[in-house]
Amino acid sequence: MPDYTYLSDVAGYPRRIVCLTEETTETIYLLGEQDRIVGISGYTARPPEARLKPKVSAFTTAKFEKIMAVDPDLVLTFSDLQADIARELIVRGVPVIAFNQRSVPEILEMMVTLARVLGCEAKGREIVGRLTADIQRIACSANFFPYRPRVFFEEWKQPLISGIRWAEELIEAAGGEPVFPELRGGRLAKDRTVEPALVRERNPDVVIASWCGMKVNKESIRNRPGWDRITAVQKGHIYEIKSTYILQPGPAALTEGVRQLHAILARVCGVPVQPEIQPSEACDPDLHKSSPGRQMSTEELKI
């Protein structure tokens, strides 16, 4: 009979983790397990100290020799976009977990699942509970808006791509109404393309742009043919949220991302933002200009 006594010495949880996207890195830091991370994506920005970890990949490409050199016992990937990377790592004998979260509930589920994999599920559920409560607090604050601004969320400029599901869901939580709700289910960018003329027809009150890896050129948005007839352009309500805060399906979107969305929509409505839900990181500088419209009192904003 084979001797399996050696199995008692096998570590129960992964200790050398490579994260090929930003959201798993940030989640592991929130869990306080950052010492287990031995490799990250070059796009990682949060938290800043994570940038000191070895960089072993971009998004759709990876340095396999660098990954193998850090001797991982687990690699975390995201979606079909990293399927080729995952396949090669599996061929090389590396354990891989691929997440595929595309909505706010799925992001929360990803965080709990990752915590479970690391052996700290209770901490993960505690974090998810706090994030959920914060989003609910923002949604309650948005109930005091005089109206819900109609929002075109622009994920890319050419072709125009409307917001992915989690961004659209966070817009709703923050107090807005997406003008292309029927497209949010498109898992691929090509499934969410829109014609500029259709944006004119939907006539959003605000344009919120987040171009992945590129600074938004507001002047180019204002100068699109016929867009001078759009309410958002006429009233100067064109804003940027850095893709780091809203286009990664993880903690950043559920914290800073939704707070910046709420701050933008509050400005459009002409109301102040409660101190406890103010964005904590760099926002669009246009948000700091004097805001037109009626200012709601502190008493009106109490929830």
Positions of PLM-derived features:
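N-terminal ligand-binding lobe of clamshell/alpha-beta domains
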Residues: M1-I303
